[in-house]
């Protein structure tokens, strides 16, 4: 089964009973997942429990890792499927690099990864990168997982309507992403300042939503949620004795607004799954995914009675279907457009990517072409998007 498209490459607590609602109208149930880096994997047991109880939220709102986990859930992945992804993912590779040796050009192989610092050349000047981590592998990982819904551009059209939080770092504003590609929303929401590059968006730059609103319960409330299930892994402000190094001080400063807002956000939840006291690893410990998920079960079990009660009271209402939409396993491009690339590099990239119009490709074949383009060593990142024509 084939479909045709345009490929663009861009180089750059307590529970409120339902008896308080009208009995003939299903209450709007929202699921809100906070950011927290690797600790966000602790959200997954809640999703598995919702599945087992037959509770399908009417809205999912997430920030940072909560956007990744919540976005997958909103597009139709089950809690068990997301847990399987978390266990099998090569997190060191996803979070730690951009190009494999096999994709590097012959001319570059002798120099590959020989140096601790790479300098880029832009506008005739040498420049250091603006992040600690090359996010090419992360982008590829996200794009692969969200491929089944690449044709969905209004997040209300996902199996579960979805919103992602980000921060406009230029103007100091919250940004609620409600359209575009799900892969872009995930990547923007997880842009931890200094760790990952900021993401260009319209006339500004986006970074992690946690800078201003790590636990965006108020977004769900403003969208008319009657019942809010909140899952918080974000943590609290560190005491003076824990602010013992530059990184801890910088992280606390960057999250200060979210920390101050967190009590208000928690108070808006009807069911609050508080993971913070139960998590023993840090935001960067992705390799501890199994432990994170096991620890996530503790907070869920503490709210089991409230979740079961919600399930019982929702049984008289129809639940929305929750599965990944059907999608074609191959794509045929009508046109391939290269943006953000000089004419001098265009021929090289076209030859290396070796992707052509009117030829069917699997997702893996598209990814391989992108990796080969990245392997020229000319670019810090290569992004791609599929557009309907």
Model-inferred region functions:
Residues 1-27:
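Bacterial Sec-dependent N-terminal signal peptides
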Residues 21-63, 71-388:
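Patatin-like phospholipase
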């Amino acid at each position: 089964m084939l479909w045709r498209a345009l490929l663009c490459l861009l180089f750059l607590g307590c529970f409120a009973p339902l008896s308080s609602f009208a009995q003939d109208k299903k209450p709007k149930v929202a699921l809100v997942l906070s950011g927290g880096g690797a600790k966000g994997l602790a959200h997954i047991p809640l999703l598995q429990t919702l599945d087992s109880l037959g509770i399908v939220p009417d809205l999912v709102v997430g920030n940072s890792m909560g956007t990744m986990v919540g976005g997958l859930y909103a597009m139709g992945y089950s809690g068990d499927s997301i847990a399987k992804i978390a266990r099998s993912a090569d997190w060191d590779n996803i979070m730690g690099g951009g190009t494999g040796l096999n994709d590097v050009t012959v001319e570059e192989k002798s120099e590959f990864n020989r140096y601790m610092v790479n300098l880029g050349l832009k506008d005739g000047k040498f420049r250091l990168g603006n992040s600690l981590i090359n996010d090419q592998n992360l982008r590829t990982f996200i794009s692969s997982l969200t491929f089944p819904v690449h044709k969905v551009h209004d997040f209300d059209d996902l199996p579960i309507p979805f919103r992602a939080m980000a921060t406009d770092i230029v103007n100091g504003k919250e940004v609620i992403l409600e359209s575009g590609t799900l892969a872009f929303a995930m990547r923007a929401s997880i842009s931890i300042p200094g760790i990952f590059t900021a993401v260009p968006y319209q006339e500004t730059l986006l970074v992690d939503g946690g800078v201003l609103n790590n636990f965006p319960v108020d977004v769900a409330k403003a969208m008319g949620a009657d019942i809010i299930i909140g899952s918080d892994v974000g943590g609290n402000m560190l005491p003076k004795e824990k602010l013992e190094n530059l990184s801890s001080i910088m992280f606390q400063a960057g999250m200060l607004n979210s920390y101050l807002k967190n009590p208000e956000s928690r108070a808006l939840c009807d069911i609050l799954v508080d993971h913070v006291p139960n998590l023993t690893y840090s935001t960067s410990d992705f390799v501890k995914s199994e432990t994170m998920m096991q620890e996530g079960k503790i907070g869920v079990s503490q709210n089991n009675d409230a979740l079961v009660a919600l399930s019982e009271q929702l049984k008289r209402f129809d639940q929305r279907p929750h599965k990944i939409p059907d999608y074609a396993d191959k794509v045929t491009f009508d046109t391939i457009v290269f943006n953000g690339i000089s004419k001098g590099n265009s021929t090289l990239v076209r030859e290396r990517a070796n992707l052509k119009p009117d030829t069917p490709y699997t997702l893996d074949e598209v990814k391989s072409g992108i990796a080969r383009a990245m392997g020229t060593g000319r670019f810090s990142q290569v992004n791609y998007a599929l557009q309907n024509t």
